[in-house]
Amino acid sequence: MSELLKMEHLVKYYGNKTSLTKALNDISLTVEQGEFTAIMGASGSGKTTLLNCISTIDRPTGGKVWIDGVCTSELKKGELADFRRNRLGFIFQEFNLLDTLTAFDNIALALQIQKCPHDKIKEKIEAVAQKLGIREVLEKYPYQLSGG
């Protein structure tokens, strides 16, 4: 197995010298390809902060994060944007789909933004939908879909 995610001595502080909040303090973790990992803890324990640092939504104050061998902590702003667009996928609990578009069209829009060739979009969507077992919902609108 190979390392899919690696964190070394991850630190995230908020605030300033007079009012400093240590959200993450020296977190190290490795997740191998194929493993499932759960992040659990009490409210305010740093779960969301940790996920935001891993996903590059927020920069850690210290330490390093590697995703599939790429040290995201060292990427410049433009490189980080390219990495997010081309290598990461996000599924938020409160996703923002366009209500006037079907699930298929919402997915197609994301592929168009990524400059996917028009003639490949349908093929890509159908292949992924088949893998995920969601072909039957592609023509539904967001309000017709379950949040789960």
Residue locations for each model-derived region?
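ABC family nucleotide-binding domain
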Residues: 2-148
